[in-house]
Amino acid sequence: MTQTSTLNRPSRRFARLALALALLAVAPIALAEIHIGVILSTTGPAASLGIPEEQAIKLWPGEIAGEKVRFTVLNDGSDTTTATKNAQRLINEDKVDLIIGPSVTPTSLAVVEIAGNAQVPVISLAGGGAIVLPQDGPRKWAFKLSPTEPISIGLVLDHLQKNGKGKSVATIGIATSYGEGFLKAFEAIAAQRGFKIVATEKYNQTDPSVTAQVLKIITANPDAVYIFAAGTPGALPQIELAQRGYKGLVYQTQGVANNDFLRVGGKSLEGGYMTVAPVLVAEQLPESNPVKKAAVDFVQRFEKAQGANSRSLFAATAWDALLIVQNAAREALKKGKPGTPAFRSALRDAIEGLHDFVGSEGVYTMSPSDHNGVDARSQVMVKIENGAWKLQP
């Protein structure tokens, strides 16, 4: 016997109408979900940056500006080709509203090219100025939070001059866009300020030794050595300098400022200097420092989750990216729904309009010509003493 429906035709029409209305009611909720793509280097040479960044992301809430938020986190393995594929997937398949990351300059440059052409905003966690300069083409959709090279370089030269240690400097940097960017900026600024560069050396992130380069530096007998590197590979030149008995000053960029760097370099790092984000020495900051409150708040949140002394300025950069997205989303939601070109464009515009926004690493003021937005307040000088960071006056 054939089973028939017990619903009469009017009842069936009513059921179909009710179902259609229910689906319409659900659709705006699904559409309103903010989807953020994240590309990090959690393996490879830059893993000491990407791992704490990922740990910070786990602290992010599931809601932004009253809307549900979904994160899709991908590992690029510190590889430009993988970062490119990740960006293509996030944009073309996942339809993300914004990308945070990648962790380092070379991968960020690759992602910015793709995302900018697709008109998807990017907040890079890397340091190279080339990510946002010049402000044209795809870079109009790119932002970065770490300070540009001139801010760090200026602080190093001020410190060297203040300590009366002479004016001859040797440099050694990784052969990537990060190292090249710092070298180019340093050459220009050093010349303007009357410093003499007596040696310029380079090495690859995967090189097992820099003995040849360091011997050339020691032969040049500089008053200071400035190392341009990111991640644990930055410890290699400083270890070699210590083993060769170099007695001058050694400076690093904040690209190496993490606990893995301290572990790998050990006692060879003692007495070295570097410019870093204030969050790394949050409790040591004077009360007058405008970022102290936000920096201490982040450190407490992060170390509650990861343990004492686990703080990381790279994690703090990821945290500040969230704070900025939260702020921008409030404005963007007034102009478009998540998942639409209007929302992505409004997000970009809201980030660009940021003014005196205090984060854990600095005070951000963006503009059409400045997609970095930080000033000298984003960097402090620290010295490595007894395996820890010590704020310098």
Regions inferred by a protein language model and the residue ranges of each:
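N-terminal signal peptide c-region/cleavage motif recognized by signal peptidases
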Residues: 26-27, 31
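Extracytosolic ligand-binding ectodomains
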Residues: 2-6, 17, 21, 32-393
